[in-house]
């Protein structure tokens, strides 16, 4: 168990129904926080008692996000942090086989979704001069992944977005950081070919995939009051794949 608590803290986690988002939500709750879980798939969250609040949200839709933010703020009154995790991987194939519709879906969820959800809470954070924005990016945003170029483009975009936004908010007590995990064994594997998965595993020097629990532990520290002097940073969880 970690040696700090998040008692009395309220967080929004997008893409909270499963995988990384669910693991982060669980860890925050274990540390005493209250979590509003945002996801399109409310059925997947129906059996999870860890959520204090749930919203069906399409993060790529401006009205859906703004309505959910208003309802969440009305419920909690104070939000201490947002974990922007919702994402899609998209098909694994070369760019010349991608349709514009497939490209747009990845960008709208993985990049525009981060903009919309973070913007919805920024004035609240600014009014209280405190907030933690954590974006779940990917090592693909630093190195690119052949077969998933739109995904890499979106994740590179959120890394640049986080660095710029972090500086815009200085010298406030609002921090903006990213996590950049290597491939993690979640339900997104269902969208990937076996050859793609094995090729990505071969690029991890530790010889295994990242776990959702490892990501959740890192996330809990980054969104805590203890992580108070770090902003605009990318925290890698890559098993040695990326060391920069």
Question: Regions from the language model: what does each represent?
Answer:
Residues 123, 167-171, 228:
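Alpha-helical segment proximal to the catalytic Tyr-Lys
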Residues 98, 144-152, 164, 192:
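Active-site loop-to-helix junction immediately N-terminal to the catalytic Tyr of the SDR YXXXK motif
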Residues 93-95, 102-107, 189, 200:
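Substrate-binding pocket helix/loop in short-chain dehydrogenase/reductase
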Residues 96, 143-149, 171-172, 207, ...:
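Active-site loop immediately N-terminal to the catalytic Tyr-X3-Lys motif
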Residues 2, 89-92, 143, 220, ...:
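Short C-terminal tail/terminal secondary-structure segment
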Residues 138:
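Residue(s) in the substrate-gating loop at a strand-loop-helix junction
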Residues 118, 154, 162:
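Active-site helix of classical SDR
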């Amino acid at each position: 168990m970690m040696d700090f608590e998040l008692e009395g803290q309220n967080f929004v986690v997008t893409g909270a129904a499963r995988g990384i988002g669910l693991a982060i939500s669980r860890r925050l709750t274990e540390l005493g926080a209250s979590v509003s879980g945002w996801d399109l798939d409310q059925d997947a969250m129906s059996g999870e008692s860890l959520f204090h609040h749930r919203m069906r949200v399409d993060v790529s839709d401006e009205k859906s996000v703004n309505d959910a933010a208003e309802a969440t703020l009305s419920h909690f009154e104070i939000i201490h942090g947002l974990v922007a995790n919702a994402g899609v991987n998209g098909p694994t194939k070369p760019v010349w086989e991608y349709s514009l519709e497939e490209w747009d879906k990845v960008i709208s969820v993985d990049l525009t979704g981060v903009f919309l959800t973070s913007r919805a809470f920024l004035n609240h954070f600014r009014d209280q001069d405190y907030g933690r924005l954590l974006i779940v990016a990917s090592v693909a945003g630093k190195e690119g992944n052949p077969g998933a170029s739109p995904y890499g483009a979106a994740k590179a975009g959120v890394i640049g977005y986080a660095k710029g936004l972090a500086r815009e908010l200085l010298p406030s007590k609002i921090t903006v950081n990213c996590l950049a995990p290597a491939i993690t064994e979640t339900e997104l594997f269902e969208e990937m070919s076996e050859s793609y998965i094995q090729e990505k595993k071969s690029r991890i020097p530790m010889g295994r995939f990242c776990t959702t629990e490892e990501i959740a532990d890192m996330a809990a520290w980054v969104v805590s009051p203890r992580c108070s002097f770090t902003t605009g940073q990318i925290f890698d969880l890559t098993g040695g794949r990326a060391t920069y």
